[in-house]
Amino acid sequence: MWFKRIGLFLLTNILVVVTISIVTSVLGIGPYLDANGLNLSSLVIFCFLWGMGGAFVSLLLSKFMAKMMMGVQIIDPRSASGAERELYSRVERLARAANLPMPEVGIYHSPEVNAFATGPSKSSSLVAVSSGLLQVMDNAEVEGVLAHELAHVANGDMVTMTLIQGIVNAFVMFFSRIISYALSTMVKDEMQYTVRLISNIVLSILFSILGSIVVAYFSRTREYRADAGGAKLVGRQNMIAALEKLRRTFDAPEDERGKEALATMKISGHNKWMALFSTHPPLEARIAALKNSGY
């Protein structure tokens, strides 16, 4: 499995470099940059290293950051009891069924009805659920949510999305610097640095926003796969029941679910007005996909 991931990583990197080279060649950018003192090869390498490197550093730190930012309390199976012990046992059983190493299991205290999985690899992953989810969902629905999150781990979605984010980062850095450099050559010498700096910041923000649409699209496709994987583990009806409960929860009036129990970027999403930027498909679409599947 690791050989496949390394191969995918290397192939992706090669494709990024080749694509950038083709684009710059077609547009005739290379000779122009060389004539104005900007080495294209060095820029490609710089953007690639920083773009991909930054994404993978984030992946390596993902468990630590999730625990710190969400206040996740890791369950110790040796001392756990009651609901915590039951949650741990469910994850343990589902992980075994999915042929996965046992992930860390945690709970974070929040009224939101949500869960997430993170971590740099299948052997170093974390599955966490909110206290609000445990209060609202019954056993079958909780298992559906856990199966969905473990399917993310089994599918290697954290690594896949990191690769995609790294590619987007590399392109954002490359083209923002190319365009800002070109703009700076159109003004007087004393203004070039200021123009290059400001335009690079503005373009980086703009391209990052556009790039997030690409990342969100791929994220939505992974959600459908995780739903399908979860259905294989616990059955289609349990997965549908979990998503139906989420839909009812988020359709409820705000005072019935708590002001903080709003849609987040984990298992549920309700960003209708920004559908292109949503990392999760609408719950209705996910439920329909499961109903039309053979799981």
Swiss-Prot record:
A single Gene Ontology CC annotation of this entry is: plasma membrane
Predominantly, its location class is membrane
How is it placed in the membrane, per its record?
Multi-pass membrane protein
Q: Where does Zn(2+) bind?
A: 148, 152, 223
User: What InterPro entries does this protein's entry cite?
Assistant: HtpX_protease (IPR050083), Pept_M48_protease_HtpX (IPR022919), Peptidase_M48 (IPR001915)
GO BP: proteolysis
Q: Does the keyword Secreted apply?
A: no
The UniProt transmembrane annotation reads: 6-26, 40-60, 163-183, 198-218
What CDD domains has UniProt attached to this entry?
A: M48B_HtpX_like
As to how many cofactors bind and how, the note says:
Binds 1 zinc ion per subunit.
Active site as annotated: 149
Q: What top-tier enzyme class does this entry carry?
A: hydrolase
Report whether Chloroplast shows up as a keyword of the record. Answer: no
Task: Name a GO molecular-function annotation.
Answer: zinc ion binding
Q: Which cofactor does it need?
A: Zn(2+)
Q: Which PANTHER family match?
A: PROTEASE HTPX (PTHR43221:SF1)
Q: Which family does it belong to?
A: Belongs to the peptidase M48B family.
Record protein name field: Protease HtpX homolog
Which organism does this record belong to?
Answer: Leptospira borgpetersenii serovar Hardjo-bovis (strain JB197)
Origin organism lineage: Bacteria, Pseudomonadati, Spirochaetota, Spirochaetia, Leptospirales
